[in-house]
Amino acid sequence: MASHPTLKTTFAARSEATTHPLTSYLLRLMDLKASNLCLSADVPTARELLYLADKIGPSIVVLKTHYDMVSGWDFHPDTGTGAKLASLARKHGFLIFEDRKFGDIGHTVELQYTSGSARIIDWAHIVNVNMVPGKASVASLAQGARRWLERYPCEVKTSVTVGTPTMDQFDDAEDAKDDEPATVNDNGSNMMEKPIYAGRNGDGRKGSIVSITTVTQQYESAASPRLGKTIAEGDESLFPGIEEAPLNRGLLILAQMSSEGNFMTGEYTQACVEAAREHKDFVMGFISQEALNTQADDDFIHMTPGCQLPPEDEDQQTNGKVGGDGQGQQYNTAHKIIGIAGSDIAIVGRGILKASDPVEEAERYRSAAWKAYTERLLR
C-alpha cells in the first residue's frame, strides 16, 4: 500500500475536497455517525432484509444487498422492497449498495442497471462492476446514470377540473376561440380547455353542453432532487443532522477480491484505477484489499469485505488473518483492513448475521472499525 494524504485526512475533511456529491455525502455521514461499517445483508427473504435494515441501520453507513437472492422481493416502484429500503435508509442514515457486480458488454450492463423488473438505479445509491469485459462497461453505466438523472430536472404537477358552464359562458368562449391563442398561465403552464358538446344541428341550433374539462400542468424546478417517494402518507422521517442523500448515483469498481485464488492480477487492478480516474463524476472508489489512491488528486473511497473479529476475550489488534469459511473467503480484522491496509469501510456479513445478538455485534464491529480509523490518523 502506497502512502497517500487521504490516509491521514479525516473523513470530514475529505468530504469537502471530493468532487463526487455522493462520496462527499457518505464521508460526512461516516463522520456524523462515527461509523465506517457496511452490513452485507445476505439473507434469503425480503422480510429478514427489511428487519435487519431497520434494526442494524443505526450502526452502519452502507447496506449491501443482493436483490436476486431474496425471495419475496416486491418490485413495485413506490411500495416495494426497494422503496421500503430507501425509506429505512433515510430514517437511519445509510446508503444502499446493490452488489450486482455487473460484468458484460456496455449495452447490456446499462440496461441491467436502468431497466428490467428490479430497476436497480431507482433505489440503490451505489452499484459495482467487474471490469473484466473492459472499460466500456464503466462508461456505459456512467451514461445510464447520467441519462436517468437528466429525467429529474423538474417536477410535473397535473390538476384536472371538470365543470358544467352556463350557456352565456359558452357563447363567450365560442365567439373568442378563433381570435385567442391557447391559454398560458403566469408560470408557463399549458391550460387546455376541452368543451364536450353535441355540436350544432342542421337548423343552426346549439346542442346541449355536457361539461368542460380543464387540464393544467405546472413544471416546477427541482434544483435539489431527492428520492421523494414514501411508503405511507406522512412518512417524512429523516436521520437527524444531515440532509437527504443526493440523487446522484455512484459506482465501485471491483479491483481486488478477498477470495483465495482469485484471478485479479496487478495489471487488472491498475486498469480499474485508470478507469476510475476517467470517470470521477460517477466512480466513487473500489472494492479492494488495500488503498489504491496514488496520484495527488486521487480521492477514491475503498470498501473491503472479509472482515471478522476474534471473540471479545481475544486480542482485537491482531494484524494477521483470522481464518476462512472453507469456501475460499479469507478473513481479516478491522485493524488489518482499516488501520494497516488503508481501506475506509469494512464490509461485514456473517460475523454479524450469525451472532446471537446481531444488533449488539454490529455495534462491536462499528466500534472496532472506527477505532482502527482514528488510530490510523494518529500513526
From Swiss-Prot:
A Pfam cross-reference name: OMPdecase
Compositionally skewed regions (Acidic residues) per UniProt: 169-178
Start and end residues of each stretch annotated as Disordered: 165-198
Gene Ontology cellular-component annotations: cytosol
Catalyzed reaction equations: orotidine 5'-phosphate + H(+) = UMP + CO2
Enzymatic class: lyase
Gene Ontology terms: biological process: 'de novo' pyrimidine nucleobase biosynthetic process; 'de novo' UMP biosynthetic process
Annotated metabolic or biological route of this protein: Pyrimidine metabolism; UMP biosynthesis via de novo pathway; UMP from orotate: step 2/2
Keyword terms of this UniProt record: Decarboxylase, Lyase, Pyrimidine biosynthesis
InterPro entries per the UniProt record, alphabetical: Aldolase_TIM (IPR013785), OMPdecase (IPR014732), OMPdecase_AS (IPR018089), OMPdeCOase_dom (IPR001754), RibuloseP-bd_barrel (IPR011060)
CDD domains: OMP_decarboxylase_like (cd04725)
Residues binding substrate, per UniProt: 42, 64-66, 99-108, 331, 350
SUPFAM superfamilies (UniProt xref): Ribulose-phoshate binding barrel
Active site: 101 (proton donor)
Molecular function terms, GO-annotated: orotidine-5'-phosphate decarboxylase activity
Entry EC number(s): 4.1.1.23
Keyword Lyase: yes
Family according to the record: Belongs to the OMP decarboxylase family.
The protein's name: Orotidine 5'-phosphate decarboxylase
The encoding gene: pyr4
